[in-house]
A protein has these predicted regions:
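Hydrophobic lipid-interacting interfaces of membrane-associated proteins
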Residues: 119-126
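Short, acidic/charged, Gly/Pro-enriched secondary-structure junctions
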Residues: 69-95
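Solvent-exposed edge beta-strands and adjacent loop segments
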Residues: 1-63, 88-115, 128
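Short beta-strands and strand-coil junctions in structured, solvent-facing domains, enriched
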Residues: 65-69, 126
Length: 128
């Protein structure tokens, strides 16, 4: 593979400290709620308060690891997991993840999911 591009082993899901699936590719989208502060007698809001951030991740082609398979973990059982992305210079971790959608391909076995949509509460970056 070309250098600098993540291979599937560089993107994985971790649950209870164990690697449960490798992910072929992902896209990430961050959104944030905000709230206007109104003041009596003012026609415009006086301030905007930053709300909570939320990260939506679209994961493509997930393969359950042998560990997960032997533990009987499937994609539907996963909760409070992390998505770990290893880049040459840093590591990005999305934590407190929950899945919000799972797409399976009927021809693939239960150990592979075509697309999983995940919502994460936190995103941290650490140097490699």
């Amino acid at each position: 593979s070309m250098t600098g591009f993540p291979t599937s082993a560089d993107i994985y899901l971790e649950m209870d400290g164990r690697k449960v699936a490798v992910v072929q590719s992902y896209t990430a989208k961050a959104s944030k709620t905000s709230q206007s502060v109104e003041a009596f007698g003012e026609s415009e809001p006086v301030a905007t308060i930053e709300g909570q951030k939320r990260y939506t991740l679209e994961l493509t082609r997930l393969y359950a690891t042998d560990n997960a398979v032997s533990d009987g973990i499937n994609f539907y059982d996963m909760a409070n997991f992390s998505l770990v992305i290893c880049k040459p210079d840093r590591r990005v971790i999305y934590s407190d993840c929950q899945w919000s959608g799972i797409e399976e391909d009927g021809r693939l076995n239960a150990m592979v999911a075509e697309k999983v949509t995940v919502v994460a509460a936190k995103r941290i970056e650490t140097s490699a």
